[in-house]
Every structure is written in C-alpha cells, then in structure tokens.
Amino acid sequence: GIEPQILDYQTQQYRLFPLLATAYALYFAGNYMSTAYSEGSQKIEKGQLEELPQLHALSAGLKAFTSYAASAGVEVCRICCGGHGYSHASGLPKIYVSVVPACTYEGENTVMMLQVARYLMKCYKDKQQGSKLPGFVSYIAEIPEKRSGMDEHLSFNCLVKAYKHRAARLIEEAAKQMQSLIQSGSPAHEAWNKSSVQLFWAANAHCHLFCVQNFVENVERSSGNTKTNEVLKAVCQLYSVHGILENLGEFIHDGFLSAQQVDYLQKAMFKLFEVIRPNAVALVDAFDIPDQVLQSCLGRYDGQVYQALYDYAKMAPMNQTEIHSTYYTHLRPLMNPETSNYSKL
C-alpha cells in the first residue's frame, strides 16, 4: 500500500506547523527591521535621534526572541525526524550548531532582554507622568480591557488585543515590583536584580506582541492571489493562537481569557492544521532554499529520501569495501586458531 506521509499525523503537525508559522512571522519581522534600520540611519545622519531608543530596544529584543525561537525550533525538527534527525545526513545538526551560538554572540540573550526591559520601564514611567509614548510602545498607555471579547471567529483584532493585554500587564507588574522594593529601602540596582525575572517576562511578551502584530499588519495589507492570502492568513492565525496556548498562564492570570475562549483557541488550532496541511510543503518551498545549501537527505526537493539515505551511507569510509579491514586484522585470526597468535584460555 501507499506509505503514510509523516505530515498527515496530527502529532507531527502540532510540533511542525507552529514552527512553519513562526518562520513566516520572523521573516516579516526581519523585513521590518531592515526597513527600520535603513530609515533610522538616514534620520541619524540628519541629527534626528528621537526614535533611536525604540529602535535599539526592538532590535535587542528581537535578536534574543528570534534566536531563542530558532534554536528551540531546530531541536523540535530534529526530534520529529526520529533517529535520522541526529545524523548529519538530515542536515539538521549543521543547522543546529550554526543557530544556537546566536543565543550568546553579540550579546547574551538574557542581557539583551533586560535592555528591552530597561526601555519599557522608562516608557511606563513616562506613561505615569502623562507623556505620550512613541510608535509601537503606545499600547502601554492604552486603557486595558478587563475581559477579552474574543469569540469562536478569533479575529486578528481580538488576538492582537490579547497580546497587548498580556504585555502591558507584565510590564506594569514588573514596574510595581521595582517601585515596591525601592520604597522599602532597596537600592535601585538591588531592586532591579530582584525584579529581573519579571522584567525578562515583560520584555519577552513585548517582543512576542511585536511579531504577532507585525505579521497581522503584513497579512492585512497583502494583495494578489486570493487563495494565497487565505493560506497566509491561516498561517498568521496559527502563529497567534499557538502562542497564546503555549503561554496560557500569562493570558488567563488575571481572568482576561475565559475557559470558553481557551476552548475556542484549541479547536481553532486543530482546524488550522487541516487548512495548512495541503499547503505545508509549498509554504516551505516558498523560501526557495536550494538542496545544495540544505545538504539534507530528508528535506529534499525531489522527495527521494530512501535513495538519498542509501547513497549517503555508501559514501561512508567504512562502506568503501565489501569486507572491512578489521575483519582481516582482528576477526579472522580469532576464527582460525591455527594461524592465531592469541593465547588460548
């Protein structure tokens, strides 16, 4: 019979499709940063430095957020390939060792996140003083909704609001924790250290919100093939929904999401798997990464996985002769006592 395809198993979809959605979210985030850097450089040359703190905070945060996501994602892909995932034939070990160092070079990720947190604390202080917050961080000053209006349709507007609520709440809690410690007599640096985990949570939520909101904005202004847009919309929705379910405690902590709404999210995720499945391979191929770069027996354009694994095994040095040399040097003497130099027991 026909061999079942790995992607038809829901457990594989649950692990791999959110990573596919993440790849698209990070792609759009990268495009945003490239444009922001180019425009920011021109403004700096003109002496316009107002947006520099926000650009620094966002770039530092995305460096950490994206490298964490990539390194964890490669490991999930490797596990999904079973034993072959640990072989160099899969190409995944090479990707893993090239991605993981990004978590520490050019700034260890925790330090990068705390730089974001420092900027967010300044924004929160400005909000308390009645100052207008710039650009993307303006959500911190918005009047928070106590309950989500999300229904089974899971509109992008409701999903983004959920991420805004989570980030704003975590920022406020971190700021109040620091203020409480300082008022209790702790020096500022000590209060910062004792609040650093909450500060990290706040910065991470801020970066996650950016990736979701930026992805949504790109999808909503996209034009062209309607069917392609529908698929991209499903990918974006999966990224948003899965992100909430993976960090559910931070979304239901203060009762913002109800049990019924969580049920909507779970059912939607499984439905989105069905929508994305027929297009999953095409969505990966759209990145147009050639086989020569991937060097993978598993992730191949022609799909000839078994033949590729066989050919890879034939190239191994130990498989260059029909009988390995160790047979003549070690095994055959043991099997022929008359010519053996080994002592008899």
PLM regions and their residue ranges:
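Flavin-dependent oxidoreductase catalytic core characteristic
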Residues: G1-L345
